Amino acid sequence: MKGMEEVVIDAKDMHYRELNEKIHEILRENPDIKKIVLKNVLGQRFIADGIQKKDLTIEIYGIPGGDLGMFMSGPTIIVHGNAEFAPGNTMDDGTIVIYGSSGDVTAHSMRGGKVFVRGDVGYRSGIHMKAYKDKVPVLVIGGRAKDFLGEYMAGGIIIVLNIDEKGNDLGKVKGRMIGTGIHGGAIYIRGEIDKDQLGVAADIKEFTEEDLEKIKPYIEEFCKWFNLPEDVKNKLLNSKWTKIAPISKRPFGKLYTPDLM
C-alpha cells in the first residue's frame, strides 16, 4: 500500500468502526496518499472524523451516516448521494460536497471550511456555527432548508440558493423560525422573506454590494462543483437577496443581566 496515491475500499456490510479504522490505518501506512474512494457506503457514521490532511480527497459512493467529517481539518469530501444528519459537525477546515441532500443539523457548530449541499437540508442546519479571526465557516444550500436555519448562530455565512436540480426557481421560501437566537454571522436567502418567518433575535438587514461581493465566490464555487451552466450562475448573482443578521450581539442579555443592558 505504501507509495499508492489512491486506495479503494468496498464498505459493503462493513461496521462503521471497521471502516474508520481502515481509513486511519491507510493514512498511517501511507501518509502521502492523495485519494481514498469508499464504495457501497450505507449509513456508516463518523467517516473522516478528526482527519488533518489538506491534500486528501475522500470520495464516497452511497449514503454516509451521521457526523461526516466531524472535527475534520483539511480534507475534501465528495459525496455522490445523500448524507445523513450533521455533516461538518464542528469542522475546523476543509470542504464537504454533497451531490444530494443532507439531514438535520447540517454544519452543526462548524467553525471553519465549507459545506456545499446540492439539494435540501434538514431542521436546525447551521446551528451554533461560529467564526474566529480568519476562520469563517460557509454553508451553501442549493435547495431549501427546514425550520430553525442558523439557530444560535455566532458567526459564519449561510447561503440558500432556492433552486431545484435543474436550476429552476423553487418559489417562495417556506422555512420558519429562521435565525432564532442568532448573535453573529449572516444568512443570505435568495428571494423574499417575511418578518413572521424570522426567529427571536433575527432581523432583515439591507443587502448591499458588499454583501454580494462576499457571497459571490461561494456561489461561483457551488456552480463549479455541481457543473451548473453560466445562465444559472448569472441568475443567482443577479437575483433579489434577503440578508438576515442579529438584532444585537447579546439578544438575550437582559434576561440575565438587565442592569448591564
UniProtKB/Swiss-Prot annotation:
Belongs to the FwdC/FmdC family. This is Uncharacterized protein MJ1350. One of its GO terms (molecular function) is oxidoreductase activity. It comes from Methanocaldococcus jannaschii (strain ATCC 43067 / DSM 2661 / JAL-1 / JCM 10045 / NBRC 100440) (Methanococcus jannaschii). Coiled coil: none annotated. InterPro entries: Archaeal_gltB, Glu_synth_asu_C, Glu_synth_asu_C_sf, Glu_synth_lsu_3. Pfam families: GXGXG.
